[in-house]
């Protein structure tokens, strides 16, 4: 079952209202049909590339059920920690469908027996040799020279400059490695398709140099991620077809004349793939009137960190109430006493306690970035399945689980004390 692409995805509520009203809040809800539709669009856009492979960054949405869906849609798992690698294996990915690309890895992470390993720094080579035999194929991450299309590339920490990468490749060849892959990760939310054309140009030029100068076989060229999605109603997603066409033009101009026309082009998109497929459902717990009207909700910054950390905008709507007239500007806050509102200010229909709000486009780097500030347990996650039913795919964390690793573990079985000091269980019954 598939769903048509939403032209205004941040306004879409994919699950029926009655199902959402029955859920305990706060919770995340993901749309299976949207996940599959986006994966299919990506495959279609790059169908011109023989052997095209899309790699999903596990850190964007590390839920085994979602990972299984993406695996069924042909995605590979892109992992940056040993924990992500272990989760990918447990989610059914074969070792050949897992790419391990740690940055500043620990010795234990370098020892992970990944069949597809990417080095971010040439200096890692000696450390890698101490931990494990060199594989027959290694990936190298390029940090391209700043281009007018991605002028902030100078500040990115990902990868090696061309000279360092070529030196590392030559050293690999001397050590018996005959096959290398190339990848890049700008991670800047580049909306202009020309930025990806410029990135492809840098990757393909480097690939041709590896092939011509060192006789190395180039096994792939991965463009990484960074393709943005629309969060405001006035925006539209980056045009994946325009991005693909620009990359294809550079491929035809550089790779085919170099005899590299069979090298697969790859992507590592996270937000573009899953952001629209997730919402955070929350309930209004209180309303404050004043110079600034406030809505308190049961979700907190511990459930969704991105707006406070990065200043990202996420559309908010009221479940079952799309009135335009009589809207008020509310600051949407939580129960953790910090000066800034965690979810921003929004024009919303007048709300009362008990109203349900939907925070949109949180299917990437939403739940995965949750933390326990304020001793807030992680909320539950649900999947709206293609057959129209809801399934719990992660239960809410229990409060006692927050303390499970402490040396002195609090006793949550003890009766709570009343303000008078009398144990709750010993209070006389009324009447």
Language-model segments: residues:
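A charged N-terminal "starter" segment
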Residues: 1-135, 174, 178, 212, ...
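General structural feature for long, well-ordered alpha-helical segments within catalytic domains
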Residues: 15, 19, 31-34, 38, ...
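Conserved, mostly hydrophobic/aromatic
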Residues: 35, 59, 81, 113, ...
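General beta-strand structural signal in soluble alpha/beta enzymes
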Residues: 56, 77-80, 100, 118-121, ...
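Active-site-proximal loop/turn and secondary-structure-junction residues that shape catalytic pockets
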Residues: 58-62, 83-84, 104-106, 121-125, ...
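Flexible loop/turn segments at secondary-structure boundaries
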Residues: 62-65, 86, 147-148, 188-192, ...
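Active-site loop/helix belt of alpha/beta enzymes
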Residues: 134, 144-285, 374
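Charged (often Lys/Glu-rich) extended helix/loop segments that serve as interaction or gating elements
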Residues: 260-431
